[in-house]
Protein backbone atom coordinates (compact mmCIF):
# COMPACT_ATOMS: atom_id res chain seq x y z
CA UNK A 1 0.00 0.00 0.00
CA UNK A 2 2.85 2.23 0.68
CA UNK A 3 4.06 1.49 -2.77
CA UNK A 4 0.67 2.35 -4.24
CA UNK A 5 0.68 5.64 -2.41
CA UNK A 6 4.19 6.33 -3.62
CA UNK A 7 3.32 5.51 -7.20
CA UNK A 8 0.15 7.56 -6.92
CA UNK A 9 2.12 10.45 -5.41
CA UNK A 10 4.61 10.17 -8.21
CA UNK A 11 1.77 10.17 -10.74
CA UNK A 12 0.28 13.20 -9.03
CA UNK A 13 3.66 14.91 -9.06
CA UNK A 14 4.14 13.94 -12.65
CA UNK A 15 0.69 15.14 -13.61
CA UNK A 16 1.27 18.29 -11.57
CA UNK A 17 4.58 18.76 -13.34
CA UNK A 18 2.93 18.12 -16.70
CA UNK A 19 0.18 20.58 -15.81
CA UNK A 20 2.76 23.16 -14.78
CA UNK A 21 4.64 22.60 -18.03
CA UNK A 22 1.40 22.92 -20.01
CA UNK A 23 0.53 26.10 -18.10
CA UNK A 24 4.00 27.44 -18.72
CA UNK A 25 3.78 26.58 -22.43
CA UNK A 26 0.31 28.13 -22.68
CA UNK A 27 1.54 31.19 -20.80
CA UNK A 28 4.55 31.50 -23.05
CA UNK A 29 2.26 31.10 -26.07
CA UNK A 30 0.04 33.84 -24.69
CA UNK A 31 3.13 35.97 -24.03
CA UNK A 32 4.49 35.28 -27.48
CA UNK A 33 1.07 36.04 -28.99
CA UNK A 34 0.95 39.24 -26.98
CA UNK A 35 4.54 39.98 -28.00
CA UNK A 36 3.66 39.22 -31.62
CA UNK A 37 0.66 41.52 -31.32
CA UNK A 38 2.86 44.19 -29.76
CA UNK A 39 5.54 43.66 -32.40
CA UNK A 40 3.01 43.82 -35.20
CA UNK A 41 1.45 46.90 -33.60
CA UNK A 42 4.86 48.52 -33.19
CA UNK A 43 5.81 47.45 -36.72
CA UNK A 44 2.58 48.95 -38.01
CA UNK A 45 3.22 52.08 -35.97
CA UNK A 46 6.81 52.29 -37.18
CA UNK A 47 5.76 51.65 -40.77
CA UNK A 48 3.07 54.27 -40.28
CA UNK A 49 5.72 56.59 -38.83
CA UNK A 50 8.04 55.75 -41.72
CA UNK A 51 5.26 56.31 -44.22
CA UNK A 52 4.41 59.56 -42.42
CA UNK A 53 8.10 60.52 -42.39
CA UNK A 54 8.52 59.82 -46.11
CA UNK A 55 6.19 62.66 -47.19
CA UNK A 56 7.94 64.93 -44.71
CA UNK A 57 11.29 64.01 -46.27
CA UNK A 58 9.79 64.57 -49.73
CA UNK A 59 8.49 68.00 -48.72
CA UNK A 60 11.82 68.89 -47.14
CA UNK A 61 13.66 67.81 -50.30
CA UNK A 62 11.25 69.82 -52.46
CA UNK A 63 11.74 72.82 -50.19
CA UNK A 64 15.54 72.68 -50.50
CA UNK A 65 15.32 72.24 -54.26
CA UNK A 66 12.97 75.21 -54.57
CA UNK A 67 15.24 77.30 -52.37
CA UNK A 68 18.29 76.38 -54.48
CA UNK A 69 16.38 77.21 -57.66
CA UNK A 70 15.41 80.60 -56.23
CA UNK A 71 19.06 81.32 -55.37
CA UNK A 72 20.14 80.32 -58.89
CA UNK A 73 17.48 82.57 -60.41
CA UNK A 74 18.61 85.45 -58.19
CA UNK A 75 22.25 84.96 -59.25
CA UNK A 76 21.23 84.76 -62.92
CA UNK A 77 19.16 87.94 -62.54
CA UNK A 78 22.07 89.75 -60.87
CA UNK A 79 24.47 88.70 -63.67
CA UNK A 80 22.04 89.81 -66.37
CA UNK A 81 21.44 93.09 -64.58
CA UNK A 82 25.19 93.71 -64.22
CA UNK A 83 25.67 92.92 -67.90
CA UNK A 84 22.88 95.30 -68.89
CA UNK A 85 24.33 98.05 -66.71
CA UNK A 86 27.83 97.36 -68.00
CA UNK A 87 26.83 97.79 -71.63
CA UNK A 88 23.87 100.16 -71.25
CA UNK A 89 25.45 103.04 -73.20
CA UNK A 90 26.49 100.86 -76.12
CA UNK A 91 23.78 101.92 -78.58
CA UNK A 92 24.16 105.61 -77.75
CA UNK A 93 27.92 105.41 -78.17
CA UNK A 94 27.58 103.65 -81.54
CA UNK A 95 25.31 106.43 -82.78
CA UNK A 96 27.69 109.17 -81.55
CA UNK A 97 30.81 107.69 -83.18
CA UNK A 98 30.07 108.98 -86.72
CA UNK A 99 29.59 112.51 -85.36
CA UNK A 100 32.90 112.20 -83.51
CA UNK A 101 34.57 111.08 -86.76
CA UNK A 102 33.16 114.12 -88.57
CA UNK A 103 34.45 116.46 -85.88
CA UNK A 104 37.87 114.84 -86.17
CA UNK A 105 37.85 115.34 -89.95
CA UNK A 106 36.87 118.99 -89.48
CA UNK A 107 39.85 119.45 -87.17
CA UNK A 108 42.22 118.01 -89.78
CA UNK A 109 41.45 120.92 -92.15
CA UNK A 110 43.71 123.90 -91.52
CA UNK A 111 42.03 127.21 -90.78
CA UNK A 112 43.45 130.15 -92.74
CA UNK A 113 41.68 133.20 -91.39
CA UNK A 114 40.89 134.24 -87.77
CA UNK A 115 37.15 133.51 -88.11
CA UNK A 116 37.87 129.95 -89.32
CA UNK A 117 40.35 129.55 -86.46
CA UNK A 118 37.64 130.43 -83.92
CA UNK A 119 35.24 127.94 -85.50
CA UNK A 120 37.95 125.30 -85.42
CA UNK A 121 38.57 126.05 -81.72
CA UNK A 122 34.85 125.52 -81.03
CA UNK A 123 34.86 122.24 -82.97
CA UNK A 124 37.94 121.13 -81.02
CA UNK A 125 36.23 121.86 -77.68
CA UNK A 126 33.16 119.91 -78.81
CA UNK A 127 35.35 117.00 -79.95
CA UNK A 128 37.25 116.91 -76.64
CA UNK A 129 34.02 117.11 -74.66
CA UNK A 130 32.46 114.17 -76.52
CA UNK A 131 35.68 112.18 -76.38
CA UNK A 132 35.98 112.72 -72.60
CA UNK A 133 32.33 111.72 -72.09
CA UNK A 134 32.97 108.45 -73.92
CA UNK A 135 36.14 107.79 -71.90
CA UNK A 136 34.34 108.53 -68.62
CA UNK A 137 31.78 105.86 -69.51
CA UNK A 138 34.36 103.14 -70.22
CA UNK A 139 34.64 103.60 -73.98
CA UNK A 140 38.23 103.60 -75.21
CA UNK A 141 39.87 104.05 -78.61
CA UNK A 142 41.52 101.01 -80.15
CA UNK A 143 44.05 100.77 -82.95
CA UNK A 144 47.25 102.82 -83.05
CA UNK A 145 50.04 102.80 -85.58
CA UNK A 146 52.68 100.29 -84.50
CA UNK A 147 50.27 98.02 -82.58
CA UNK A 148 50.13 94.34 -83.49
CA UNK A 149 47.21 93.60 -85.81
CA UNK A 150 44.41 91.75 -83.99
CA UNK A 151 41.48 90.57 -86.15
CA UNK A 152 39.20 90.78 -83.10
CA UNK A 153 39.89 94.51 -82.73
CA UNK A 154 41.00 95.66 -86.18
CA UNK A 155 39.68 95.43 -89.71
CA UNK A 156 42.49 95.33 -92.31
CA UNK A 157 41.45 97.47 -95.28
CA UNK A 158 44.73 97.52 -97.16
CA UNK A 159 48.32 96.25 -97.11
CA UNK A 160 51.36 98.47 -96.87
CA UNK A 161 54.75 97.14 -98.05
CA UNK A 162 57.61 97.30 -95.55
CA UNK A 163 60.18 99.99 -96.46
CA UNK A 164 62.35 99.94 -93.31
CA UNK A 165 62.53 96.42 -91.76
CA UNK A 166 64.07 97.77 -88.54
CA UNK A 167 61.17 100.14 -87.76
CA UNK A 168 58.32 98.41 -89.57
CA UNK A 169 57.42 94.86 -88.60
CA UNK A 170 55.18 92.51 -90.53
CA UNK A 171 51.70 92.18 -89.04
CA UNK A 172 51.75 95.57 -87.31
CA UNK A 173 49.46 98.50 -88.05
CA UNK A 174 50.93 100.99 -90.55
CA UNK A 175 48.12 103.56 -90.62
CA UNK A 176 44.81 103.91 -88.80
CA UNK A 177 42.22 104.93 -91.37
CA UNK A 178 39.31 105.06 -88.92
CA UNK A 179 39.57 104.75 -85.13
CA UNK A 180 37.91 101.84 -83.43
CA UNK A 181 36.16 101.91 -80.06
CA UNK A 182 35.68 99.37 -77.32
CA UNK A 183 33.29 99.35 -74.35
CA UNK A 184 34.90 97.32 -71.57
CA UNK A 185 35.60 93.99 -73.33
CA UNK A 186 33.10 94.48 -76.19
CA UNK A 187 34.15 96.02 -79.51
CA UNK A 188 31.73 98.75 -80.58
CA UNK A 189 33.49 99.35 -83.86
CA UNK A 190 36.71 97.75 -85.11
CA UNK A 191 39.50 100.07 -86.22
CA UNK A 192 39.96 100.31 -90.00
CA UNK A 193 43.70 99.90 -90.57
CA UNK A 194 46.45 99.31 -93.08
CA UNK A 195 48.83 96.50 -92.15
CA UNK A 196 52.53 96.09 -92.98
CA UNK A 197 53.30 93.08 -95.18
CA UNK A 198 56.38 91.84 -97.03
Swiss-Prot record:
This is Protein GrpE. Homodimer. Residues 22-39 have a biased composition (Basic and acidic residues). NCBIfam families: PRK14140.1 (NF010738), PRK14162.1 (NF010759). Residues 1-56 are annotated as: Disordered. Belongs to the GrpE family. Residues 40-56 have a biased composition (Low complexity). The gene is grpE. The lineage of its organism: Bacteria, Bacillati, Bacillota, Bacilli, Lactobacillales.
Amino acid sequence: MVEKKKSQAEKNNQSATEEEIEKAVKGSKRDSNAADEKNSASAAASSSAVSDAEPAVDYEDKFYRAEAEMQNMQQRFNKERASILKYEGQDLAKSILPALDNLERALSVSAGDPASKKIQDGVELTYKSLSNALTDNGIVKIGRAGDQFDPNLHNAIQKTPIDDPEKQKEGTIAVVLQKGYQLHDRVLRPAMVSVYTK
